Design a protein with these regions (language model features):
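Cleavable N-terminal export/targeting peptides
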Residues: 1-28
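Outer membrane beta-barrel
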Residues: 26-46, 58-185, 193, 202-206
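Short glycine/serine/proline-enriched coil/turn segments at secondary-structure junctions
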Residues: 82, 189-191, 220-222
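Short strand-loop junctions, especially beta-strand C-caps/beta-turns
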Residues: 183-187, 215-217
C-alpha cells in the first residue's frame, strides 16, 4: 500500500511539474522578469594626499565603483494586450568594497522604484526614477558616452540638478527621430522634499543627436532654481 501511494504521489508531482513548465512557456511570450546587475571594484593609488600642511602622503584604497556604481535590479514587463504593456523597475546601488548601500543609513534603499504603462501613445511611469534632464544629457551629449554613469566624474548630475527625483510622474513619447518628455514630482509637503517641473525635446538621426531641456526646481523652503541645457553630439 505504501508503494502504491508513493507511485501516485510521484505521478501527481510529475503532472504538476509538466503543467508548470507549460504555463511558463506560454507566459514567456507575453511577460518577462529580468534580474540584472553589475559589480565594480577599483584600486586607487593617490599621492599628495592629506591636508595642505602635509599633503605629501600617499593613499592606497579599494573603492566601490571605478567606472560605474555597483548595482542590481529587477525589470518586469507584462503584456496587457492591445499593444500596451505594464512595466516595473526596482534598482539598488551599493559599494562592492564594503557591501553597504550607496544611499547610506538614511537614504532610500532603492535608487529606482517605479511602475508604468507603455504603448502606442508613449510611456507613462510613476515613482522614484531618473530626472528627465539627466535622461537627456546622458543620451545626447554625455561627457563620457561609453559610460555616462561613470562613478568618478559625473558633470551630468550637475547639469540635471540631480540624477533622480522622488514622487515623480514621467511621460515620454517618440515620433520618428523626435522624442519629447515631461516630468512632474510632488513635494508632498515634506521638509526635505522638492517639487520639479521638467521638459525636453531631443532629435536623433544619422548618428547625430541634439536636445534642449528645462527644469524648474522648488525647494521645501519655497526657493526656486531653474536650469536650461542645450547640446548635441
Amino acid at each position: 500500500m505504501k508503494k502504491v501511494a508513493a507511485k501516485k504521489f510521484f505521478a501527481l508531482g510529475a503532472i504538476a511539474l509538466a503543467s508548470g513548465s507549460a504555463f511558463a512557456q506560454a507566459s514567456t511570450s507575453t511577460s518577462s522578469v529580468q534580474l540584472y546587475g553589475i559589480v565594480d571594484v577599483a584600486y586607487r593609488h593617490t599621492n599628495n594626499e592629506g591636508p595642505a600642511a602635509n599633503n605629501s602622503q600617499t593613499l592606497n584604497q579599494l573603492v566601490g565603483g571605478g567606472m560605474s556604481q555597483s548595482r542590481w535590479g529587477i525589470n518586469v514587463s507584462e503584456d496587457l494586450g492591445g499593444g500596451t504593456k505594464a512595466l516595473v523597475n526596482m534598482e539598488n546601488r551599493f559599494g562592492a568594497d564594503t557591501g553597504t548601500p550607496n544611499s547610506g543609513a538614511t537614504g532610500p534603499y532603492f535608487q529606482q522604484s517605479w511602475v508604468g504603462l507603455q504603448g502606442g501613445y508613449g510611456r507613462l511611469t510613476m515613482g522614484r526614477q531618473y530626472n528627465i534632464l539627466f535622461d537627456l544629457v546622458t543620451s545626447t551629449y554625455a561627457s563620457y558616452p561609453y559610460s555616462p554613469y561613470m562613478d568618478v566624474y559625473k558633470p551630468e548630475i550637475g547639469f540635471a540638478l540631480g540624477a533622480r527625483a522622488d514622487n515623480m510622474i514621467k511621460y515620454m513619447a517618440e515620433v520618428g527621430p523626435v522624442r519629447g518628455a515631461l516630468q512632474y514630482s510632488f513635494d508632498e509637503k515634506s521638509p526635505t522634499g522638492g517639487k520639479t517641473v521638467v521638459g525636453y525635446l531631443r532629435y536623433a538621426a544619422n548618428g547625430l543627436a541634439a536636445g534642449l531641456g528645462y527644469q524648474n526646481y522648488e525647494f521645501a523652503s519655497g526657493k526656486k532654481l531653474e536650469a536650461w541645457t542645450l547640446g548635441g553630439s
